[in-house]
Design a protein with these regions (language model features):
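Short amphipathic alpha-helix that is part of the acyltransferase structural core
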Residues: 1-62, 69-76, 142-178, 208-211, ...
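Short hydrophobic/aromatic beta-strand element in the GNAT-like acyltransferase core
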Residues: 42-46, 57, 79, 191-196, ...
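Residue-level recognition of the GNAT/N-acetyltransferase active site
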Residues: 83
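Conserved acetyl-CoA pyrophosphate-binding loop and the N-cap/start of the following alpha-helix
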Residues: 86-98, 219-227
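Conserved GNAT acetyl-CoA-binding A-motif
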Residues: 96, 101-115, 231-240
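Glycine-rich, histidine-containing beta strand-loop boundary motifs that form or position
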Residues: 114-117, 124-125
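Active-site/acyl-donor-binding loops of N-acyltransferases
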Residues: 125-143, 205-208, 213-290
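Amide-forming acyltransferase catalytic core, primarily the GNAT-like/NAT-type
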Residues: 127-223
């Protein structure tokens, strides 16, 4: 490997090739959507072999989150992958080391990601931030809940539900109508479904007779009841305060690394990032995966 840099427009198809090799379970339909709507060449850090072949990528996605009641610009890291033939050579770690100064240059005060391996990212300076209940829902807790009426997905209503649901929490992405329009489009792809009631919504991926809930907000009991009436099992991510209610295990969902301490703690009342992050963890919630 002799180069780690932001890829060029002419290398964008190569980045898609790397994604396919690194994440073979993703459909071509989803990959095409992701590269058309969620990322772009200037957001992709690439690792190149000595002969100039793209062998690894790391996506630096700009986000704005609510952090202790204040908007903060962060970098959400996604699509970290090295082609199978070049793994276990320290390439992913090298990409992260190259990414940190670039993140600061671009004005990000922190980096957040969903870990595939908590220990790996802890070695890179990340720490657990968002915990969530993740697993198969105990549908017995939904017995007796009236089956809700279904309404057509509506981006404006989803945004209103999301904002109200997230208000007690911190660490969540600040969204707009366009974000929900994109999510509705994404979850209209093959193998996905969106369900919405008057006071809740859920974005799901379907595997056989199982609904895997990517995100659910509002009165989540109503959307989960609706899904339980359609599928034999429902797996979901829920805030930790619902973990016992739905019988799911609490796990690390997102990790954080401080990039610019002064910017992160500005207006929070804390004198160090360590104190601010420790306090934020108590009520942190996010649905972002990629």
């Amino acid at each position: 490997m002799n180069d780690i840099r932001i890829i060029k427009q002419s290398e964008y198809d190569d980045a898609k090739r790397v994604w396919r090799l690194c994440f073979p379970d993703d459909s071509d339909e989803f990959i095409d959507y992701y590269f058309a709507r969620r990322t772009s060449p200037e957001l992709i850090l690439g690792a190149f072999s000595r002969c100039g072949e793209l062998i690894g990528t790391l996506h630096l996605l700009p986000r704005e989150i609510s952090f202790l009641g204040h908007p903060k610009r962060i970098c959400f890291v996604a699509g970290v992958g090295t082609v199978p033939s070049m793994r276990h050579k320290g390439i992913a770690s090298a990409m992260f080391e190259a990414a940190y100064p670039l993140m600061k240059k671009r004005g990000f005060c922190a980096s957040i990601l969903q870990p595939f391996n908590v220990g790996f990212y802890e070695r890179l300076g990340y720490e657990p931030f968002v915990y969530a209940g993740i697993g198969e829902i105990n549908t017995a807790c939904l017995l007796g809940v009236p089956l809700p009426c279904v309404v057509a997905p509506d981006a404006d209503k989803m945004l209103s539900i999301y904002n109200a649901f997230m208000r007690p929490f911190t660490g969540f992405a600040l969204r707009d109508k366009a974000c929900f329009e994109n999510l509705i489009s994404e979850f209209s792809l093959s193998g996905s479904v969106t369900v919405m009631t008057e006071n809740s919504y859920a974005f799901c991926c379907i595997e056989g007779s199982c609904a895997n809930v990517y995100e659910s907000a509002g009165d989540i009991t109503t959307s989960l009841t609706l899904l339980a009436s359609r599928y034999s099992s429902v797996k979901a991510l829920v805030p930790t305060l619902y973990s016992d209610v739905f019988g799911v295990k609490q796990s690390v969902f997102n990790m954080i690394k401080v990039i610019d301490e002064d910017v992160l703690i500005s207006h929070t009342g804390f004198s160090t990032a360590a104190e601010a992050v420790a306090h934020a963890k108590k009520t942190a919630l996010s649905f972002d995966k990629y």
